[in-house]
Design a protein with these regions (language model features):
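Conserved SAM/SAH cofactor-binding pocket of Class I
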Residues: 117, 121-203
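N-terminal auxiliary segments of SAM/dcSAM-dependent transferases
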Residues: 2-108
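Short alpha-helix immediately C-terminal to the canonical SAM-binding loop
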Residues: 176-177, 219, 246
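Active-site capping/gating segments
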Residues: 241-274
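Conserved beta-strand elements of the Class I
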Residues: 111-112, 145
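Conserved beta-strand signature within the Rossmann-like core of class I S-adenosyl-L-methionine
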Residues: 233-241
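A short glycine-rich, Lys/Arg-flanked "PGG" loop and its adjoining helix->strand segment in the class I
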Residues: 223-232
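Hydrophobic beta-strand segment of the Class I
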Residues: 210-212
């Protein structure tokens, strides 16, 4: 039976203002396959492709005194069983994000997501916040870029909301495979382009709407690259940071104006306009 090398991380309450950003930024250096945070933010399970990556991340976590980590091996069937037990359809405004085993009938537009290593099942606050901010924009005839697409959920939401040209970008081949499956599952394979690239090498036509559900540290580091992807008068939706860090994120984009914000628990999201 296949097993995933993983870390179980316990975060001591109360979490500091920038602790989640620090943790995400540290883990990002070791290329996790998936980060699965509990809704209260106090426990994370982080999956890796190799035990070497997991073990290196485990050693690095010693630098963050607010967390305790343990190395585990998670059987493939445990992941599947847990997701089917725990994940149900989630509403976000006019949209519903649902796993294949809990698809609701009628009413709102449904995005079907098969949980895998691509982040974005709709259960984490950052995904929901991005979905809600996206629904505040008129996407008809818009070109939309989803940078760090993960499961493809935000790209699919843009398509469902009327965007005529959607591009999903990620640097993780496993996430892109999951995104490709989800996009096909929702009948959008011909409507959404999928690109493997990094922000510092991405060369692509600019868009009216750019979404980046990443981490605060990554958003600040690649602020110039994200800014360059937005057309004049266009919008940038960002999430993956704490409410107390909203000002820091806004200052990273000095040419853009914050026009909307949302918060949920320990997470926040912003819409900026160029």
């Amino acid at each position: 039976m296949a097993e995933y090398p993983a870390l179980d991380i316990e975060i001591a309450p109360p979490a500091g203002d920038s602790l989640y950003d620090r943790l995400y930024a540290l883990l990002d250096d070791y290329q996790p396959a998936a980060i699965d945070p509990a809704e209260d933010g106090g426990h994370w399970r982080v999956f890796f492709r190799t035990a070497n990556q997991r073990d290196a991340a485990f050693a690095a976590l010693a630098a963050i005194r607010e967390v305790r980590a343990s190395a585990v091996e998670v059987p493939d069937e445990d992941w599947a069983r847990r997701t089917q037990e725990d994940l149900r359809a989630v509403e976000a405004g006019r949209l519903i994000v649902a796993p294949p085993w809990d698809i609701p009938r009628g009413g709102k537009a449904v995005i079907v997501i098969e949980p895998s290593t691509g982040f974005g099942t709709g259960h984490h606050a950052t995904t929901r916040l991005c979905l809600l901010l996206l629904q505040q924009l008129d996407l008809r005839r818009a070109r939309v870029l989803d940078v760090g697409t993960g499961s493809g959920v935000l790209a699919l939401a843009a398509w469902k909301l009327g965007a005529h040209d959607v591009v999903a970008v990620d640097n993780d081949p496993d996430a892109l495979a999951n995104a490709r499956e989800n996009i096909a599952r929702n009948g959008a394979a011909a409507a959404i382009d999928i690109i493997r690239d990094d922000l510092d090498t991405l060369r692509i036509q600019r868009a009216e709407v750019v979404m980046a559900n990443l981490t605060g540290a990554v958003l600040v580091r690649y602020a110039e690259e994200l800014h360059s992807l937005v057309v004049k008068g266009g919008y940038l939706i960002v999430s993956g940071f704490a409410p107390d860090d909203m000002a820091v994120i806004a200052r990273a984009f000095p040419a853009m104006k914050v026009i909307a914000e949302k918060r949920e628990g320990d997470w926040a999201a912003l819409t900026l306009r160029l």
